[in-house]
Swiss-Prot record:
This is Probable galaptin lec-8. One of its GO terms (cellular component) is cytoplasmic vesicle. Residues 11-138 form the Galectin domain. PANTHER family: GALAPTIN LEC-8-RELATED, GALECTIN. Keywords: Lectin. One of its GO terms (molecular function) is carbohydrate binding. It comes from the Eukaryota. GO terms for biological process: defense response to Gram-positive bacterium; endoplasmic reticulum unfolded protein response; IRE1-mediated unfolded protein response; response to toxic substance. It holds the Pfam family Gal-bind_lectin. It comes from Caenorhabditis elegans. InterPro entries: ConA-like_dom_sf, Galectin-like, Galectin_CRD.
Length: 180
């Protein structure tokens, strides 16, 4: 298992090995309502959002799930948001063949179909109105040092989750271009 303790929000963190069926990601924290009215956990691949899980609190009290490729959003899938202001949560993303099984505090929230290959995921992004205590990863081989530098094949996710963020673009020869 690999754990990231007290990551900043917003931030993006490398997932050093490819996702596969059996991989699990757990994000533990609590809801805050500072200047944001929602928070998101995203699985990222270069300029693409492979999985967007957005907890909304202001107008629609929902969890919206989606994907985004080259700035174009797919069809949004909505579910009831089980969280309220200051609630503690454990968001679990379990990778299965063909879908992500997503639960909150041990309760099934949704199954979201893979719209892009899970092998394309490079990072997890956190942004919005949440304090995150830890992110934990299990079900990987852990054959590399997850704390070392990572070559994304692009400039990385600098300033992810801020107004100045510009999504990175894969280098022309990078193998991940084949996924999109």
């Amino acid at each position: 298992m690999h754990t990231i303790n007290s990551p900043d929000v917003p931030s993006a963190h490398a997932i050093r090995e490819q996702l596969r069926a059996g991989s699990e990601i757990h994000v533990r924290g609590h809801v805050t309502h500072k200047h944001h009215k929602d928070f998101s956990v995203e699985l990222l691949s270069g300029p693409h959002i492979v999985l967007h899980v957005n907890f909304r609190f202001e107008h629609d009290h929902i969890v919206a799930m989606n994907t985004c490729t080259n700035g174009a959003w797919g069809a949004e899938i909505r579910h009831h948001n089980p969280l309220k202001h200051h609630d503690h949560f454990n968001l679990s993303i379990h990778v299965h063949e063909g879908y992500y099984h997503i639960s909150v505090n041990g309760e099934h929230l949704a199954d979201f179909p893979h719209r892009f290959p899970v092998e394309s995921v490079q990072a997890i992004g956190l942004k919005g109105a949440a304090h995150i205590d830890e992110i934990s990863f299990s079900g990987f081989e852990f054959g590399v040092d997850w704390n070392s530098q990572h070559d994304f094949g692009h400039a990385g996710y600098n300033s992810y989750g801020t107004e100045t963020y510009v999504a990175p673009v894969f280098q022309e020869t990078h193998s991940y271009n084949a996924y999109f």
